Amino acid sequence: MDVTALGSGQPRRIALVAHDNKKADLLEWAAFNVETLMRHRLVATGTTGRLLHDRLELAVERVESGPHGGDLQIGAQIVQGEIDLLVFFWDPLEPQPHDPDVRALLRITVLRDVPTACNRSTADYLISSPLFALRAAA
């Protein structure tokens, strides 16, 4: 995370991803935080992005769905320094056909020091962090 930009007033670029069994959880979290999310640039994998747009009227850049390379597209944006926060509600109990892509995405967030939330509690901590608010202040 580039802490030198804190307080710059720049909106953050937030990636939102959810496996099928976790989409309802992500939508509930996003609805609770919709006012905050509206002030930032959002990118999401296919179906997740469509749901966020259709149900919450959020402006969302959509990449491919996860199994079709969307996780890798978000990972590439992380490598390019284009993602500031990843909220990824993944299902640890359900094997995914694209598990290697999921692992690669989570690995690159660690390598690039991108704050990552894999559940609601962590997402709540990150989005309510004073550091998050400082960076997002207008």
Regions found by a protein language model. Give the residues of each.
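Glycine-rich, flexible N-terminal cofactor/catalytic loop recognition
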Residues: 24-42
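Short internal beta-strands
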Residues: 39-48, 52
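Short hydrophobic/aromatic-enriched beta-strand-loop microsegments
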Residues: 41, 58-69
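General beta-strand structural signal in soluble alpha/beta enzymes
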Residues: 43-45, 62-64, 88, 116-120
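Mid-chain, well-packed structural core segment of small domains
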Residues: 68-108
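Short, glycine-/small-residue-rich phosphate/pyrophosphate-handling segment
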Residues: 117-138
